[in-house]
């Protein structure tokens, strides 16, 4: 979203970089690497540090942190990394994505950012007022993109029990605002974390690591919604069309639009894995549900009823 790429464009560029052997497999949802890959990280970071964009951001001979090392959390493919191949003759767009991956790698294996955080609570006329302040003591990973220079709220060296002089007061009146429209970035994030609000503990646990779609399919899901006219892009926002709103009004109360259904299926798949349920039984349940929801949707006049085509009959 920062550079104006759609999710599909980003995935296409990442695929090109992968085919050029510049990055590892891009269709991964993992943020972790196993031990054997971690052994290669110092060499890869040193390689990134030879590139002009990052030469001042990689500390020579620094030991990479292990925050992202956990073989148990690696799915089919480990986290996205650059390889040791030189990124030569890249287009502007390809270069942007490549260096985003390289920069995130440096951040992931840099030291923690250390802050001194101060919380002051002051009492006046029976009312308590709180202010927070922080000062970065060690920039760590924030130094990669210069985030340590962001404005910090510093608080004077007050001591507990100090009496302060009131210099003025004001009342600010405002109204709550609805959540903004989704961008591709926020929608991708929402798809990835879908299910966290499910109340049923078992279903929420089943959804923990899946969400809606996969890293390989989420971009195409968004693109399909656009191509079928359910939404359109307005600058960086995704806006539902009249057709999309009509679809939502029909299916929003159906199980097909309930993220908990995905949790139920994941739970059933786990039972199959444990030998508690036969795959054939699960398949028949899915087939029956598919027939049911298809019939229900096709009978909906709001979606498939007759309407004026806008074309005159030639006869």
Model-identified regions with their sequence ranges:
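Basic, low-complexity terminal or inter-domain segments flanking catalytic cores
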Residues: 2-12, 26-315
